[in-house]
C-alpha cells in the first residue's frame, strides 16, 4: 500500500462526505437503509478511535417524495422548499442510525457566507470542535433553505474540503456512486482508464470529468476540483464508492487517493485563499508581482498601479498583475480612497501614518 493510502488509513480525524447518489435508489428515492449501512462503516472507524465529521448531501432528494414531486426541482424556491422538508428526514435518519450505537448527532447548516466572513468562520470552527469534544457526530450540510446562488458553495464536495481544513482533519473521504477517478466516464466508456493515485498534474493528463447527476449537483468535475483543493491545503483525499465504504474507511485500499502537499496550509492562509470573499482588487506592476509572489514580501503602495472596488482597511482584496491575472489575495491595510491617493508613491514620500505596507506579507497568500 502506498504512503498516501497509509496516511488516510492512519488518520485520527476524518471528514466523510456522503453524496446524494449514495443515499438514493436507482429511481431517485431516498433510502434510509443505505444510510444505515454507511453508519455501520463509519461507526467501525469511530470505534477504532477516529473522530469523524460527516458532510451529507441528500436534503433536496429526501424532500422530493414527501412533496409529491417527480423530479428534482430546477427553480431556487422549490429547491429550498424541498430542502426544508428533506433536511428533517435526512437528519432524523442519521440520528436514528447512530442511536443504535448510543451516539448523538448535531446538525450544522452552513452557507458560503458563514465561511467567508472571518468571525462566522471561527464560530463554525468552534461549534464543530465542541461537538466532537462532546462525542456527538456533526452532520454538516449547506443551508439550502436560505442560500442564494450568490452565496452558495455550489455543492457539498467543495463544502467538505473546506470543513476538512476547518476542523483540522487528517484526511477527507468522498463517498459517491463511482469507485474512483477515471480518464472518462466508465458508465459510458467501457475502456475508461482508472486513476489509482493523483500525486501531481501529470496524473490528470487526459482526464475528462463529467458534470452532476439529476439528483445531486456534484459530478466528477466537482469531486476532482474539491479533492485537489483539499490536497493542496495539506489534507489527503480518498475518492471511493459508497458501496465500498467499509473497505475505504478500514484500510483505504480502494478508490483514488489524492496526495496532500507536505506542508499543511495554516487556517488563516486557507481562509484567505479559498474561503474569504474579496471586495476589490489592486493592480500591481511587474516588480511588485515579483516581490509578492517570488520573494513573499509585503506589498507597498509604490508597486500599485490601479485600485478597483469599494473596500476598507481589513477587507480581503485580489492582487492582479499588469495582465489582470490574479496572483495573490490579501487583507488590505487601507481604504480604497486612501490607496488611490497613495499608489505609485514611495514610502519616503508618504506621511508617517501611511507608511505601513498596503498588504503585509503575513496577510498575503499567492494563488
Swiss-Prot record:
Keyword presence, Cytoplasm: yes
Xref: SUPFAM superfamilies: Carbamate kinase-like, PUA domain-like
Substrates-to-products reaction catalysed: L-glutamate + ATP = L-glutamyl 5-phosphate + ADP
Any one Gene Ontology BP term: L-proline biosynthetic process
EC number: 2.7.2.11
Disulfide bonds: none
Principal EC category: transferase
Name by which UniProt lists this protein: Glutamate 5-kinase
Organism: Mycobacterium leprae (strain TN)
Gene (UniProt): proB
Amino acid at each position: 500500500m502506498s504512503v498516501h493510502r497509509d496516511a488516510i488509513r492512519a488518520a485520527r480525524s476524518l471528514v466523510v462526505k456522503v453524496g446524494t447518489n449514495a443515499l438514493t435508489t436507482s429511481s431517485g428515492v431516498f433510502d434510509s437503509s443505505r444510510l444505515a449501512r454507511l453508519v455501520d462503516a463509519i461507526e467501525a472507524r469511530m470505534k477504532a478511535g477516529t473522530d469523524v465529521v460527516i458532510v451529507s448531501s441528500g436534503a433536496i432528494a429526501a424532500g422530493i417524495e414527501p412533496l409529491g414531486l417527480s423530479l428534482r426541482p430546477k427553480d431556487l424556491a422549490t429547491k429550498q422548499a424541498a430542502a426544508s422538508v428533506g433536511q428533517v428526514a435526512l437528519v432524523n435518519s442519521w440520528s436514528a442510525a447512530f442511536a443504535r450505537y448510543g451516539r448523538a448527532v448535531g446538525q450544522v447548516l452552513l452557507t458560503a457566507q458563514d465561511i467567508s466572513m472571518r468571525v462566522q468562520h471561527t464560530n463554525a470552527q468552534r461549534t464543530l470542535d465542541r461537538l466532537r469534544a462532546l462525542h456527538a457526530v456533526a452532520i454538516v450540510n449547506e443551508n439550502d433553505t436560505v442560500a442564494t446562488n450568490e452565496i452558495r458553495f455550489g455543492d457539498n464536495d467543495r463544502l467538505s474540503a473546506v470543513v476538512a481544513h476547518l476542523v483540522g482533519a487528517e484526511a477527507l473521504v468522498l463517498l459517491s456512486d463511482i469507485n474512483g477517478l477515471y480518464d472518462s466516464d466508465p458508465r459510458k466508456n467501457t475502456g475508461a482508464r482508472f486513476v489509482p493515485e493523483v500525486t501531481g498534474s501529470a496524473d490528470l493528463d487526459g482526464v475528462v470529468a463529467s458534470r452532476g447527476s439529476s439528483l445531486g449537483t456534484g459530478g466528477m468535475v466537482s469531486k476532482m476540483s474539491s479533492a485537489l483543493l483539499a490536497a493542496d491545503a495539506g489534507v489527503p483525499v480518498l475518492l471511493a464508492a459508497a458501496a465500498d465504504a467499509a473497505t475505504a474507511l478500514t484500510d483505504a485500499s480502494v478508490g483514488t487517493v489524492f496526495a496532500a502537499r507536505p506542508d499543511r496550509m495554516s487556517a488563516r492562509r486557507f481562509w484567505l485563499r479559498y474561503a474569504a470573499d474579496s471586495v476589490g482588487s489592486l493592480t500591481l506592476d511587474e516588480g511588485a508581482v515579483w516581490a509578492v509572489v517570488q520573494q513573499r514580501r509585503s506589498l507597498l503602495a509604490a508597486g500599485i498601479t490601479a485600485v478597483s472596488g469599494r473596500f476598507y482597511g481589513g477587507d480581503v482584496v485580489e492582487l492582479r498583475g499588469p495582465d489582470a491575472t490574479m496572483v495573490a489575495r490579501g487583507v488590505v491595510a487601507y481604504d480604497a480612497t486612501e490607496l488611490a491617493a497613495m499608489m505609485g508613491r514611495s514610502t519616503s514620500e508618504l506621511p508617517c501614518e501611511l507608511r505601513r505596507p498596503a498588504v503585509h506579507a503575513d496577510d498575503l497568500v499567492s494563488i
